[in-house]
Every structure is written in C-alpha cells, then in structure tokens.
C-alpha cells in the first residue's frame, strides 16, 4: 500500500507499507524535492534525513503503527512520513473511504516538454474531492525555475497559470479545457494535476 504526505513548499514524502497476515511486515520511506526529484540519501547533504527514514521504518514495524516519535533533526520529513504511513494504513484497512481523495496538498509532476525540455510541478490542494487551491512552477533543463513574468504565450506565464488555476477550481479535477493560446500549458498542467491526484487517492 502506497501513500503520500501533504506537500510543503520544499518537499513531499511517500511511504510503501507491506502487510502480511494483517501485520506491518516492512515500510519503505522516500522523499522528493520541490522539483519532484527523489532525494538520494547516500549523497543528500543532510544525513539526518536518511537516518530518519531508516530509523522510522524500523520503529513502525516494531510498533505495528505509524504512531512513532519524530526523529530529532528531521522534523518535517518525520511528520510527512508518519502522515504517509497513516494514509497507507487507511488504504490497507479495508474500510470504504468516504471520498475519492484525501484532503490535503499534493505535489504532481508533468511529462517533459519536447519543445523546451522543461517540466511542470504543481501543488494541488483538495478538499471534499474538489481542487480548492493550485500553484505551479516550471523546471528548466538546468533545474532552475522559470521566471513567471517571462512572456511565453504572447502573454506572461503567470497570467496563463492564473487562467488555468481559475479553470481548475471550477472544473472536474484534472480536466481543464484547452486555454486559447496556451495549449501546451493546459495539457502539461492537466498531466501534472492528474499525477498529484494519483497521490491523493484514498484507495
């Protein structure tokens, strides 16, 4: 059973929980940057993060629960992993969920554009199966963030994003109709939003 935490401005955590004979047999914890790139704990410059992942995994198996102590020096990561494991255990419980999606903010990533070699990362906030907030950034091939004031569609990128956001709040999650003059942005945004929705699924 796999689930994700709420996304912060800097990262998002995921958990894969293995259940055997009704018990937690194993837990794999991962963490991703705000560019939706998985952190390699063997090279990541904050060693507490990798240590926290290993320690919390073992503690959760021992406790048969997500109810473990926050790892000192990795509070944000620990909180996210605990939430992700709690959500995975909800999926494993067999109880029919009330909603299709968990309430929260989820980080999605689009495909890479064949036109410019960039991809889009979006933060999608859900409540009662509706998108209630949305923000995005474009990650360039050199892994810098596109300045949103740059004109890309004959109008500033930020304006196109706002048009998409307005449509996203009003439409079925993940299915915004093509915005005139910003076809590529619409398709890429929908792809990234659906990726975030996949992370938010309650079963």
Question: For each predicted feature, which ranges?
Answer:
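Active-site- and interface-proximal helix/loop "cap" or "latch" segments in soluble metabolic
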Residues: 2-101, 109-203
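Short, conserved active-site entrance elements at the starts or edges of catalytic domains
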Residues: 104
């Amino acid at each position: 059973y796999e689930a994700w935490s709420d996304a912060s401005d800097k990262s998002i955590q995921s958990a894969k929980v293995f259940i055997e004979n009704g018990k937690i047999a194993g837990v794999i914890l991962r963490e991703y940057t705000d560019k939706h790139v998985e952190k390699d704990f063997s090279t990541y410059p904050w060693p507490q993060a990798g240590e926290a992942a290993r320690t919390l995994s073992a503690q959760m198996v021992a406790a048969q629960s997500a109810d473990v102590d926050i790892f000192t020096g990795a509070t944000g990561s620990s909180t996210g992993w605990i939430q992700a494991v709690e959500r995975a255990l909800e999926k494993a419980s067999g109880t029919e969920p009330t909603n299709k999606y968990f309430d929260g903010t989820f980080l999605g990533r689009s495909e890479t554009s064949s036109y410019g070699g960039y991809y889009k990362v979006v933060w999608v906030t859900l409540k009662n199966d509706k998108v209630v907030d949305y923000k995005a950034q474009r990650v360039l091939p050199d892994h810098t963030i596109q300045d949103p004031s740059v004109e890309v569609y004959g109008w500033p990128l930020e304006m196109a994003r706002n048009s998409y956001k307005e449509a996203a709040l009003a439409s079925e999650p993940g299915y915004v109709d093509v915005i005139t003059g910003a076809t590529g942005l619409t398709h890429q945004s929908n792809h990234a939003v659906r990726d975030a929705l996949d992370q938010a699924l309650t079963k």
